[in-house]
Swiss-Prot record:
It is found in: Cytoplasm. It comes from Bacillus subtilis (strain 168). One of its GO terms (cellular component) is cytosol. PROSITE patterns: UVRD_HELICASE_ATP_BIND (PS51198). PANTHER family: DNA HELICASE IV, UVRD / RECB / PCRA DNA HELICASE FAMILY MEMBER. This is DNA helicase IV. Residues 212-610 form the UvrD-like helicase ATP-binding domain. ATP binds at residues 34-39, 233-240. The gene is helD. The lineage of its organism: Bacteria, Bacillati, Bacillota, Bacilli, Bacillales. It comes from the Bacteria.
Length: 774
C-alpha cells in the first residue's frame, strides 16, 4: 500500500467515525424531540384544564393571569426547544451527506504538535463534548483554510492574533459519507473542487457553496471593520453568494446580539428573492428580511398613488424612444437620479422654513372648519429657529385644540338632532350606561330629556370628528403633492435644470392622473421626510444592497438616510447598469458615500460561465480586459443569423431541442423588453413548449422560459439564447450593457440569434471566439 492509499484509508476511516458520532447525536435528538413533541401536544390539549380561571375579584383575577402566563411560558419554552432540536437534526442530516470539505494542520507558535482542523458546514463535538470533530466554516480558525496556503499563517480571535504555521492543506469531496476525491493543495481552493462544483446544472434555487469560497470572497464575508463595504464584481464573480455567506457569518459571529430581523437585503426583484431564499436556511440560519425598493415605495405611497415600477420605467425608455415626451422624460429621469437634485430639494426645504408651505383646508360635511391660509399663518407665526418638523408637530397640536373647540360648537347643529333620531336601541343603551357611570341621574330621573340629548350629541359629533383628528395626527393637512410640484417652479435655487419647466409640466401631468413616476418616488419621499421629520430606522444593523448599479445615486443616498445606524454592504457591476437613470447618467455605485469612510473590493475572476463564454462576453466591453475567466471549458458560443422572425423562432426551437437532449434543465430565451417577450412567446409556442416570464412576481421554475433581460439579472441558466441581437435592437452604449447582462446569465452554453445586421457589440467580438451557424 503506497502513502496515498494509506492516507485515503485513514481519511475514510475518520469519516466513518464521524458518521457514527453523528448518528448517535441524531438518535438522541430524535428521541428527545419526540418526547418534547408529545409534551407540547399534551400541554396544548390540557392548557385550560391546568389553569385555574377565576375573575370574581381583583386578587383572584391576578392569580388567574399569573397562572395563564406560567402555563404559556412553559408551552413556549417547550416549543422553542423543539424548534432548536429540529434545526440541529436538519444540520446533522446535511453533515451526514458530507461531514466536511477541508482539513488544515496548524502548529500554533510555541506548540510542538500540529492540530488537525476539519472544516464543514456546521460544527460537531465529540461524545464527551470536549473536542471539535468538525469546525464551522465561520469559526475564526477556519479562516486559515480560505486565506492561506501552507506556510506562515494567522487568524484573529477577539482581542488577539494567533500566529503559527500551516503544514498541510487538504480538500475533500465526500458524497453520502463516502470519500470521492482528496487532494493536497498549495492554492486557496483547488481548481479540481471548483471544476466539480461549477460543472453542475443550474437550479431554480441558488446553491450554497461554502467549500469553494475564494480568498477575495472570504475577505468580504469576514469584514467587520468597514462601516460601508463596496464590492464591484464582474458578472458571475460570486458577489451575491459572498453577500449571503456574509449574512450567515454575521449571524454566527454575533449570535445573541444580532438576529435575522436586524439584517435587510434590498434585491432587484421578487424573482431574485425566490432564487436566493434557500441559501441561509441551508447554512442553518433564518432568512434575513428581504425587500425590493419598489416594495418600500408601495408600502409608503401605494395607497395614495399608482406607483410606476423600475421595470415599467425601463420598458418605457426602451419602447417609446420616438414619443414626443421621451427627451423630456429622459432628461427628468437623469436629473432626478443625481445628488444635485437632492441638493436642489435641500435648498427648497430650507426656503420653506420662511415661506412657501402649502396646506389643505380642513373640511367637515362640506364646510371649511379651518382654512389652509389659517394653518399657514399659524405655522409661520412659530419661531423660525425651530425646525420644520418641530413646527409641524406644534401646528398639529394647535389644530387638535381648535378641532376640540369646534367639536363642542358642532353639537348644537341640526344634523346632529337628525342623526340622533336614526340611532338604534344599542346606541341608546350605550348612552344610558355612560350616564349611569357619570352618576348624572338615576333610573328614576332618566326622563331628563335634555341631558340625554346632550350626551347623544357629544357621542355623535365625537365619532364624526374622529377621522379628522386622526388625519391631523398623521399630518394629512400638509399638501405634500403640491409642495413637490412647487419645487419645479424655480424654488430650488442654483441646482436647477435647463429643461426644468418641461420636466415640471410632465411631472404635473403624471400627478394629475394620480400616477407616481418611478424617478419621482425617492425624491418625493425624501422631501416629505425632511418636512414631516419621519423617524429613522435604528433597529436595522446591517443593510445589504445587491445589484447596486440599478439604484440611482439619489436612491442610494435616500436608503442611507432611512437606515443611518446600519453598516452597509453594497454589491454591483457597472457593466450591468441597465436601468433608465444610467442611459445618460452617473453609473458609479459610490457617489453618495464620499463623505463616509468606505472600503472597496474588486472581484475580477468570474466563475459562473465557461471560459469560452467569458472570453466572448468580455470582448463586448470596452474595459473588459481585466475580467478573468475560471478555466472551465465548454462549447464555443454560437452566433446565428436568421431571415426574419419566422426563421428566428424555428431556429430557436431547434436549438432548444438540442440543448434539452444534452440535459440542460434551465434554458432562457432572453429578450430586450417585455413587449418583445410577449411577441417571441406567441411565435415560439407554435414550435416548442416555452414559459413566458414578463412580470417580476412570477416564480422561477425549471424548463424553457422567455424573459426580459431586466428580470433575468442576478439569475443564472444552463443555457441562454439571446433573441434578435440585431443592430436595430442593440446599438447604443446602454444597449451594450443590456446585451452583456443577457449573455452573462449563461453557465454552459450561449447562443446569440439575430435578424438583418448583427449588433456592433457582437461583430466587435473576434471571430475566433465563437462559431457561426446560418
Amino acid at each position: 500500500m503506497n502513502q496515498q492509499d494509506k492516507e485515503w484509508k485513514e481519511e475514510q476511516s475518520r469519516i466513518d467515525e464521524v458518521l457514527k458520532e453523528l448518528e448517535k447525536k441524531e438518535r438522541f435528538l430524535e428521541t428527545s424531540a419526540g418526547g418534547l413533541k408529545h409534551d407540547i401536544i399534551g400541554l396544548r390539549k390540557s392548557f385550560w384544564e391546568d389553569v385555574k380561571v377565576n375573575f370574581d375579584d381583583a386578587h383572584e383575577a391576578i392569580e388567574t393571569m399569573a397562572s395563564i402566563k406560567q402555563q404559556a411560558e412553559l408551552l413556549s419554552d417547550r416549543e422553542h426547544n423543539h424548534r432548536r432540536m429540529d434545526q440541529q437534526l436538519k444540520r446533522i442530516h446535511q453533515l451526514k451527506k458530507s461531514p466536511y470539505f477541508g482539513r488544515i494542520d496548524f502548529i500554533e507558535n510555541g506548540e510542538e504538535q500540529a492540530e488537525r482542523i476539519y472544516i464543514g458546514l456546521a460544527s460537531c463535538l465529540d461524545e464527551k463534548e470536549e473536542h471539535f470533530l468538525i469546525y464551522d466554516w465561520r469559526a475564526p480558525i477556519s479562516s486559515l483554510y480560505y486565506n492561506y496556503s501552507p506556510g506562515k499563517a494567522e487568524y484573529e480571535v477577539p482581542g488577539e492574533t494567533i500566529e503559527g504555521e500551516m503544514v498541510l492543506k487538504r480538500q475533500f469531496m465526500i458524497k453520502n459519507g463516502t470519500l470521492k476525491a482528496m487532494f493536497n493543495t498549495d492554492m486557496t481552493i483547488g481548481d479540481e473542487m471548483l471544476q466539480e462544483v461549477l460543472s453542475h446544472h443550474s437550479d431554480t434555487q441558488m446553491k450554497n457553496i461554502v467549500s469553494t469560497i475564494q480568498k477575495e470572497q472570504n475577505q468580504i464575508i469576514r469584514n467587520e471593520k468597514s462601516k460601508i463595504l463596496i464590492v464591484q464584481g464582474a458578472a458571475g464573480s460570486g458577489k451575491t453568494s459572498a453577500a449571503l455567506q456574509r449574512v450567515a457569518y454575521l449571524l454566527y459571529r454575533h449570535r445573541g446580539v444580532i438576529d435575522a430581523g436586524q439584517i435587510v437585503l434590498f434585491s432587484p426583484n421578487f424573482l431574485f428573492n425566490s432564487y436566493v431564499s434557500s441559501v441561509l436556511p441551508e447554512l442553518g440560519e433564518e432568512n434575513m428580511e428581504q425587500a425590493t425598493f419598489q416594495e418600500y415605495i408601495e408600502h409608503r405611497l401605494g395607497r395614495k398613488f399608482k406607483c410606476e415600477s423600475p421595470f415599467d420605467q425601463l420598458e418605457y425608455c426602451l419602447t417609446e424612444t420616438k414619443g414626443g415626451d421621451f427627451p423630456t422624460r429622459l432628461a427628468g429621469i437623469t436629473w432626478k437620479a443625481g445628488l444635485s437634485f437632492q441638493q436642489f430639494i435641500n435648498e427648497y426645504v430650507t426656503r420653506l422654513s420662511s415661506e412657501g408651505m402649502i396646506f389643505k383646508n380642513i373640511i367637515f360635511r362640506g364646510q371649511k372648519l379651518i382654512t389652509k391660509e389659517q394653518i399657514q399663518s399659524y405655522f409661520y407665526s412659530l419661531d423660525q429657529n425651530h425646525s420644520i418638523p418641530n413646527r409641524m408637530e406644534q401646528t398639529a397640536k394647535w389644530l387638535l385644540s381648535e378641532l376640540n373647540k369646534l367639536e363642542k360648537k358642532e353639537r348644537r347643529k341640526d344634523w346632529v338632532v337628525h342623526e340622533a333620531e336614526l340611532l338604534d336601541k344599542e346606541d341608546y343603551l350605550d348612552v344610558y350606561k355612560k350616564l349611569q357611570e357619570r352618576k348624572r341621574f338615576s333610573e328614576s330621573t332618566f326622563n331628563d330629556y335634555q341631558r340625554e340629548q346632550q350626551l347623544l350629541a357629544a357621542i355623535i359629533v365625537k365619532k364624526a370628528f374622529k377621522p379628522l383628528k386622526q388625519a391631523v395626527r398623521l399630518l394629512a393637512f400638509l399638501d405634500v403633492t403640491q409642495l413637490y410640484l412647487q419645487l419645479f417652479s424655480g424654488w430650488g435655487g442654483k441646482f436647477q435644470h435647463e429643461k426644468m419647466d418641461a420636466i415640471g409640466e410632465l411631472t404635473r401631468s403624471a400627478f394629475t392622473d394620480n400616477k407616481l413616476l418611478y424617478e419621482d418616488a425617492a425624491p418625493f419621499l425624501y422631501m416629505q421626510d425632511l418636512i414631516e421629520g419621519r423617524k429613522k430606522n435604528t433597529k436595522i444593523k446591517h443593510l445589504f444592497i445587491d445589484e447596486a448599479q440599478d439604484y440611482s445615486p439619489f436612491q442610494m443616498a435616500y436608503m442611507r438616510s432611512i437606515f443611518p445606524a446600519a453598516s452597509m454592504t453594497v454589491l454591483g457591476d457597472i457593466n450591468q447598469s441597465i436601468y433608465a437613470h444610467t442611459i445618460n447618467g452617473d453609473q458609479r455605485m459610490d457617489a453618495c458615500f464620499e463623505d463616509e469612510p468606505a472600503e472597496y473590493v474588486r472581484l475580477k475572476r468570474t466563475y459562473r460561465s465557461t471560459r469560452q463564454i467569458v472570453e466572448f462576453t468580455k470582448a463586448m466591453l470596452q474595459d473588459g480586459a481585466d475580467i478573468e475567466p475560471f478555466n472551465r471549458s465548454g462549447e464555443m458560443p454560437l452566433v446565428v443569423k436568421t431571415e426574419g422572425h419566422e426563421s428566428l423562432c424555428q431556429k430557436l426551437a431547434q436549438e432548444i431541442g438540442r440543448l434539452k437532449k444534452k440535459g440542460h434543465e434551465t434554458i432562457a430565451v432572453i429578450c430586450k423588453t417585455a413587449h418583445q417577450c410577449i411577441q417571441a412567446h406567441a411565435h415560439m409556442s407554435e414550435y416548442t413548449d416555452v414559459r413566458l416570464i414578463h412580470k417580476e412576481n412570477q416564480p422561477f421554475q425549471k424548463g424553457v422560459c422567455v424573459i426580459p433581460v431586466y428580470l433575468a439579472k442576478g439569475i443564472e441558466f444552463d443555457a441562454v439564447l439571446v433573441y434578435d441581437a440585431s443592430e436595430e435592437h442593440y446599438h447604443t452604449e446602454h444597449d451594450r450593457r443590456l446585451l452583456y447582462t443577457a449573455c452573462t446569465r449563461a453557465m454552459h452554453m450561449l447562443a446569440v440569434f439575430y435578424t438583418g445586421e448583427a449588433s456592433p457589440f457582437v461583430t466587435a467580438v473576434p471571430p475566433h471566439l465563437y462559431q457561426i451557424a446560418e
